[in-house]
Amino acid sequence: MQELTPMMQQYMEIKQKVKDCILFFRLGDFYEMFFEDAIVASKELEIALTSRDCGNNEKAPMCGVPYHSATSYIAKLIEKGYKVAICEQVEDPKLAKGIVKREITRIITPGTFIDDNISTANNFICCISKDRSEFALTFVDVSTGEMYSCLLEEDLQKLVNEIGKYSPSEILISNIEDELYEFLKKNCTSFVQMIEFVDLQKCHEIIENQINVGKIDEKLILSVGNLLKYLTETQKISFDYIRRFEFYRVQNYLQIDINTKRNLELTESIIQRSRKNSLLGILDQTKTSMGSRLLKKWIERPLIDIIEINKRLDSVEELKSNYSTLVQVEELLSRMYDIERLSSKFAYKNVNAKDLLSLKKSIEVLPTLKQFLSSFDSELLKEIYEGLDTLEDIYALIDSSINEDAPVSLKEGGIIKEGFNEEVDRLRNISKNSKELLVEYEEKERNLTGIKNLRIGYNKVFGYYIEVTKSNYSLVPDRYIRKQTLANAERYITEELKKLEDEILGADQKLIELEYQLFCEIRDRIEAQIERIQKTASNIANLDVLCSFARIAIDNEYVRPNVYLGDRIYIKNGRHPVVEKMIGRGNFIPNDTELDQAENRVLIITGPNMAGKSTYMRQVALIVIMAQMGCFVPADEAHIGVVDKIFSRIGASDDISSGQSTFMVEMSEVANILKNATPKSLIIFDEVGRGTSTYDGLSIAWAVLEYVADKSKIGAKTLFATHYHELTELEERIPGVKNYRVDVKEEGKNIIFLRKIVRGGCDSSYGIHVARLAGIPEEVLKRAEEILKQLEEADINRKNIRKLRREIKKEFTEQIDFFSYKKEEIIDKIEKLDILNITPIQALNILSELKHEIIKAKERQLI
C-alpha cells in the first residue's frame, strides 16, 4: 500500500469499503476503474482496457467512461447483475491541498437504479421479513417515492404471487434465511440479496428518523425498517420524501396468482414478453407516465369492493358521455411531464433547470384542467377536483427565476432569468459588455488626464494596464502606479482599473457560482413543497387512467358492466379485448356466457383444437377482471357477480430449471388451485391431464372436475375445456354441470371453425382435420385415417377404459347378479341388449361386468 501513488492509495482505501461493487472513481471528466474492476467492466461494457502507473513498479489495469454518459454504462452493469459504487470528488480541485478529497456518494443496485431515459415503468425494491407464521413484505420505488406493505400467511406460493405483482428488481432478506434465499433464487427473476437485519427497536428509530407516514403495523416494522436502513446506507440520502405509504391486505383485492397473470397475458404477452398484445397494451391509452404506471397496478390488483368499483365506473361513464370535455382533458394531460419522479430527483439533488421547466409546463395546465373537472358530478372525479392543487406559487417562482433556454448543466451559467437577482444582472452585464466597459474607462481617463492617445491594453503578466507615450509623461496623474517601462512608453495601473479587471476576469466564474447558489435555493424552496407535488401527481394519474378507460370504451364499443354482490356472471356477446384488436372487430365471433352457483356452476367445453376454446375461456376471465378494475368491457351486456380469486391452468411447459416435467408442473398448478379456490372464485381449466397417458389423464380430469363442482369441497364457477369427451357424462351425474362445445361445420374432409359456443358435447376431436389445416402431407393424413378406422373397429383400449369406469363409477343404473346365471342366460341377456339405445360408456360398463362375472362363475364351475 505504501508503494502506491497517493491517488492510488486513496482508491484502494475507498475500494475496501465496497468490495462487492464495481467502483466508479471520479477523475476529472471520467469515472475510472482499476485492477479487477477494470478487467470485468471492460469486458462487460466492451470498452478498451488500458493501464496506469500505480507506483509499485507495475501498471494497474484501467478503463473509464465519461461522467456525462455514465448512466448508460451503469445500466448495462446493473442489468448483468453487478452493483456500482459512485465515488465523487467532494471538493474543488483548484482549492485542494494535495489529493482531492473523494467519497462514495451512492451505491447503485438493481432496485435503486433510476434513469428516465431507459424506462418510465416502476422499479421496485422489496424487503421480506418473517415472523412466526407470516411474511411481511415492503416495496419501495425510490424514483417515485411510493411505498407499499402487506402481510401474508407463510405460504411460499402466495409469496411468489405477491412478489410477481411488483416484479421488483431486487429482494432483500435476512442473512439467516438460507432456505428462503434458495427458494427465491429459484422461483424469482429478481436480484436476491441477504443482508444483516437490525432489531425491532432500531427499526423503529430508523422509521421515525426517515419517513413521516403515520402509525405502521408492528408486524411490518422489521420489513420497513431494514429496507430503509439499506436504502439510506446505499443511497446516502434521507428518504423523508416518501409520503405515500399504503398498507393493504391481499384479500381486499381480486387475487390473481402469478400463473394466471402469465396465462391471461395481463401485463405482457407470452411470446413477445412485452406489453404489446397484452391486456395492459390494449387498455393503456394514458397520456402520462404516471397514469401508465397506475394502470398496471389496477390491472394487477382489481377491486372487490363494489362501492369503489362503481365509483370508477360512474367516472368513466361521465367522461364517456362528455366527449368534447374528454378530448380537451386528454390534450391537457398530454402536456404533463412525469412530475411524480421529481420527488426522488429533489432528494438526490439531481434536479436541473430543465426539470424545473418541465414542472412549470406541467403546472401551467392545472388551472384549466381543474376548471374542466368542476363540471363533473361523479364522486371520484369530484375527489380528484378537490384534491388537485394548481401549485400556482411554484409556477410563479419557476417562471420568474429560470431561463426558458437554460442548459442542463448547472455549471455553465445561463440558468437564472434576467431581473430575478440584481447581482446576477450586474455580473452578466460585465461579462457581456467587458469591451464596452474598458472603452468607457479609456475614454474617461483620456478626458480626465488630457492624454488623447492614452490606451488600455492587456498582457498575462500584469493584466489590464494604461499605456502612456513619452510625450505625455507630464500629464500622468499621481494615482497612476507604474508597472512597466518600455522604450517609448510607460505602462500604469490604477485602483479603479484593477477593480474593473477583477470584475471582468472574475465575472464569468462569479456568475456561474452565484447562479448555482440561487438555483439551489430555488430547488430547496420547491423541495419543501414536494408533498403537494406528489398529491397532484397522484390525482393526475387517477384522472389519466379513468380517461383511458373512457377512450377505449368509446373506440372499441365497450359497455358498462353491472357489478354486484351476487354469484351470477352473465355476458352477452362477450369478446376477447386483445384478440379482437389483433384480427379486427368484424372478424371476431362474440359468445355468451352464463355462470352461477345453482344451474351453471361448471361448463365443460369440448371441441377441436384451434376452434377457440382457450380464447373463449380467457375472454371470460378478462371481462371479469376489467369489470372489477372499474373498466367498461367488450360485450353487449355484462352482469358480473364479484369474484374473490381467479385461477387458470392453461398450456403445458417443462420447468427445466427445477427438473419438473410438463405433467408435474401441470399437477402443481392444479394442486394450488384446489387448495386455494373458494365458492366465490372463477377457475379456468384447459385440458387438465393431457401431460400424461390417456387413462391417467382422463381419471385425473374427471376427479378434479368432480371436486371443484362439489359445493361441499369448492363449488367454484369453472370453465373446463377438455378433449376427454367421456367427461360430458358428468352433466347427467352432477347438478350444475353443463356441456358446451365449439361449433364446427363439416364440408367433406374439411371443417370450418364457427368459433361459436353452443350447448351440448362434442364426440369428435377432429384431430386429422386440424392436421390437414396445419399442412401435414395428404399421404400422411390418409394413412392416419386408415389407422384411426382400425383402432375404432378394434377398440384396442377397451379393457383399460372398462377398468377406469369401474373405479370412478358412482352409480350403475342396474345391478345384475350374474353368479346365478347359466351360460345360456348370459347369452340371452347379451342378445336382448338394445345396442342402439345405450351409450358407448354404458356398453363398456356392461361388458366389463359380464367378463368379471363370467370369470367368477368359471372359478365356481357355474359355467
From Swiss-Prot:
> Which GO CC terms are listed, alphabetically?
cytosol
- Molecular function terms in GO for this entry? ATP binding; ATP-dependent DNA damage sensor activity; damaged DNA binding; mismatched DNA binding
SUPFAM superfamilies, per database record? DNA repair protein MutS, domain I (SSF55271), DNA repair protein MutS, domain II (SSF53150), DNA repair protein MutS, domain III (SSF48334), P-loop containing nucleoside triphosphate hydrolases (SSF52540)
Protein's UniProt keywords contain DNA damage: yes
Record key words, sorted: ATP-binding, DNA damage, DNA repair, DNA-binding, Nucleotide-binding
PANTHER family per the record? DNA MISMATCH REPAIR PROTEIN MSH1, MITOCHONDRIAL (PTHR11361:SF34), DNA MISMATCH REPAIR PROTEIN MUTS FAMILY MEMBER (PTHR11361)
Q: Which family does it belong to?
A: Belongs to the DNA mismatch repair MutS family.
What's the name of the protein? Answer: DNA mismatch repair protein MutS
State the organism named in the record: Caldicellulosiruptor bescii (strain ATCC BAA-1888 / DSM 6725 / KCTC 15123 / Z-1320)
Gene name, Swiss-Prot/TrEMBL: mutS
